[in-house]
Amino acid sequence: SSAASDVYKRQEEYNGKKFGDTQDPLLVSVRSGARASMPGMMDTILNLGLNDVAVEGFAVKTGNPRFAYDSYRRFIQMFSDVVMEVPKSYFEKIIDEVKADKGVVYDTELTADDLKELIVRFKAVYKEAMKGEEFPQDPKVQLMEAVKAVFRSWDNPRAIVYRRMNDIPGDWGTAVNVQTMVFGNKGDTSGTGVAFTRNPSTGAKGIYGEYLINAQGEDVVAGVRTPQPITQLEKDLPECYSQFMELAMKLENHYKDMQDMEFTIEEGKLYFLQTRNGKRTAQAAIQIACDLVDEGMITPREAVMRIEAKSLDQLLHPMFDTDALKAGEVIGEALPASPGAAAGKVVFTAEEAKELGKGGKGERVILVRLETSPEDIEGMHASQGILTVRGGMTSHAAVVARGMGTCCVSGCGAISIDEEAKQFTLGGYTFTEGDYISLDGSTGKIYKGDIKTVEATVSGNFGRIMAWADEYRKLGVRTNADTPADTKNAVRLGAEGIGLCRTEHMFFGEDRIPKFRRMILSDTVEKRVEALKPIGEFQKADFKAMYEALEGRPMTVRYLDPPLHEFVPTEEEDIKKLAE
């Protein structure tokens, strides 16, 4: 409490403004500052300090009443959602009703008077949800409650899931940053954006990002509007662009890593809101690490330490078969937000993805959403790929998908989606739940049907990183392999031998399992010896091929481990067939 009061005083002194002032009120944002970056997982509150009186002073100061009332409307909505847990959907519904009444399509078409009406209705929703308590007018109370809420959001379900997936300790806790507000929605010389100093999908050097003119930061990240590429800023606001490029390079040289930066331009003046080391795909991580070594910024040892070992798994993910891809029918194209090839059944909710996909029934699913929100994280994790109608390359879906190594195509405005009826139309076709589509996250192309994928190959920079890793590592690495093909692959990827060969896996092939079952079902010793002969032959051939592939490297063989009932069928039809 005393820390929050201290912040309150310091902000007023530093800015030379007062909270709740009737002429020029001080407004702040309250956001988290955890030790590890967790994009979209924790809560932020903007425009704090507005109340029924301050909003009028703000309208006078900015000379833009529409903007002032829109800021207040957003604050009530965010404060209610984050601090008091009044669901967002209540407010979205009211906005849709008012837009329908006024006969407009976009939020931006609502007038100052329309927004005043929204504010009255929003405060009524707050009062009802809070059992008669009015929306707080004292900025001190607003600040205290907001700070407490951001601390609490460390333990919200999506943040817990994200930490579990990324091995971030729960006891680290978070900090809360209180920043003076700057506004990107003050007209055509204002804007807001997110940019990376290198491409987070491929690692290519050069500014990569997006911005929206006349918008607040939340609009870019939430994926509600699809933004402009950063290069367009050079045409719109050339001075800001050159200053931005200079500062972006300065930040990268200081942190010696690719930066993910949020910025706002307020009436032609550029502000950086935050910078952090950017989330990237494994492919980009390798490219960036090698480039930074070549540019003399880091050493090879640092390059190896920068790459998360488990992320390298992404590079061995499948790609589309070239011939199958040529034959495939392209039904749409959008933004290539996270690379990779994905084909699977269409699902429309994160819950269905979780139930059917990885960790559930194990089917291949593609999650199709209007836009994803942080609550969808588990469903995104269970999907082969993600397709969104709204949002850009820096939207929540794109950032989280890249971090997970999941293929993602975003901002496909050509899709007409009906989430209730569980169907969407694209390229003249209608797709319902369970239909197959394929996504190419490297090109942004969307294909009809289930396109065949093939194993990936190891590229040049991957080899460089692995060679550096070999130089510095102390451990020897062997692999699990049960077939000659797996063994060849393991040797190709640098394994020093086979740590475990599980012999039972040799029997699961379609042509082999019947022979093994015949041995299990033999009712005399003679029949069993007879049935073992073909098994011995294919096992001998497998071992021979594996030893040849190993070229003298060691192999540990485990004899039959599972109980025999695991080799017999469980489906009614297969049992019948076996009995016959």
How would you name each of these model-derived features?
Residues S1-G328, E363-I366, S373-E378, Q384, ...:
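Nucleotide/phosphate-binding sheet-loop regions of phosphoryl- and nucleotidyl-transfer enzymes
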Residues L273-T275, T432-N480, D486:
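C-terminal domain-closing interface element
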Residues M297-S383, K445-I446, D450-I451, F462, ...:
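Protease-associated
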Residues M404-T406:
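Residues forming the flavin
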Residues V409-E420:
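Solvent-exposed beta-strand/loop surfaces of large extracellular or lumenal domains
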Residues Q423:
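Active-site glycine-rich loop that binds ribose-phosphate moieties when present
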